[in-house]
From Swiss-Prot:
<feature type="lipid moiety-binding region" description="S-diacylglycerol cysteine">
    <location>
        <position position="23"/>
    </location>
</feature>
<dbReference type="GO" id="GO:0005886">
    <property type="term" value="C:plasma membrane"/>
</dbReference>
<keyword id="KW-0564">Palmitate</keyword>
<dbReference type="InterPro" id="IPR038641">
    <property type="entry name" value="Csa_sf"/>
</dbReference>
<keyword id="KW-0732">Signal</keyword>
<comment type="similarity">
    <text>Belongs to the staphylococcal tandem lipoprotein family.</text>
</comment>
<keyword id="KW-0449">Lipoprotein</keyword>
<dbReference type="Pfam" id="PF04507">
    <property type="entry name" value="DUF576"/>
</dbReference>
<feature type="lipid moiety-binding region" description="N-palmitoyl cysteine">
    <location>
        <position position="23"/>
    </location>
</feature>
<feature type="signal peptide">
    <location>
        <begin position="1"/>
        <end position="22"/>
    </location>
</feature>
<dbReference type="InterPro" id="IPR007595">
    <property type="entry name" value="Csa"/>
</dbReference>
<keyword id="KW-0472">Membrane</keyword>
<protein>
    <recommendedName>
        <fullName>Uncharacterized lipoprotein SAS0074</fullName>
    </recommendedName>
</protein>
<keyword id="KW-1003">Cell membrane</keyword>
């Protein structure tokens, strides 16, 4: 009798394990599918092509509003004992007017004596004409001018055709918020990792983890966000990461 109970318990545990594992794999597939709607658009070499591309629309959108694309890419590095240095750019591409404006930003975040983070962000307003980003105000710093001139968004060279091949992700899902994420360990042979290393001075040989994180309805929503992040180093006082986002919003919100 005791042996029979043990067998029943083992079988029950086995079914429970399979069920939980199946749920995890199902949620991973849902998260991938949610991101795939946007990531399948990468790469978009000519950003002005986005004027003719429509994102997810729901009943929150005005029928006359064609929406606005928001693009953001940034690289962040922090050595021990130093500030977290961030450089990036954000563009707002209005499909109604077919005009684009935004800014290039440089930030240095360091904790004060009480441990509170203090930002020191500088913004340089820009606009885009004929797929070229140009400053709208005079910039005296030649390095900043060069950085703006040479800047490329990840959406212009990133490629996620192999997204379906990423396996065994660390999955997190909170239906209450709702927020969700999937994290994958990459190798330095990954196409996107190679592209980042070609464009940025990344002071580590460690292969990054890819984090897909978002909020809102997994099946689609005009609210919330979807971000991707390549985390090379994440330690106390030392961080190296690259983040990117491509969002489609109501024009009145931006």
């Amino acid at each position: 009798m005791k042996r029979l109970k043990k067998i029943v318990l083992c079988i029950s545990f086995l079914f429970l394990t399979i069920f939980i594992g199946g749920c995890g794999m199902g949620k991973e597939a849902e998260i991938k599918k949610s991101f795939e709607k946007t990531l399948s658009m990468y790469p978009i070499k000519n950003l002005e092509d986005l004027y003719d591309k429509e994102g997810y629309r729901d009943d929150q959108f005005d029928k006359k509003d064609k929406g606005t694309w928001i693009i953001n890419s940034e690289m962040a590095t922090q050595n021990k004992g130093e500030a977290l240095k961030i450089k990036g750019m954000v563009l707002y591409m209005n499909r109604n007017t077919k005009t684009t404006k935004g800014y290039y930003y440089v930030n240095a975040i360091k904790n004060d004596k009480d441990g509170r983070p203090q930002e020191n962000e500088k913004r340089y307003p820009v606009k885009m004409i004929d797929n070229k980003v140009i400053p709208t105000k005079e910039i005296k710093d030649e390095n900043i001018k060069t950085e703006i001139k040479n800047f490329k968004f990840f959406v212009q060279y990133g490629n996620f055709k192999d997204l379906k091949n990423y396996k065994d992700g660390d999955i997190s899902y909170n239906p209450e918020a709702p927020i969700y994420s999937a994290k994958y360990q990459l190798t330095n042979d990954d196409y996107n990792v190679k592209q980042l290393r070609e464009r940025y001075d990344i002071p580590t040989n460690k292969a990054p983890k890819l984090l897909l994180k978002g909020s809102g309805n997994l099946k689609g929503s005009s609210v919330g966000y979807k971000n991707i992040e390549f985390t090379f180093v994440e330690e106390k006082g030392k961080n190296i990461y690259f983040s990117d986002s491509l969002d489609y919003k109501k024009s009145g919100e931006v």
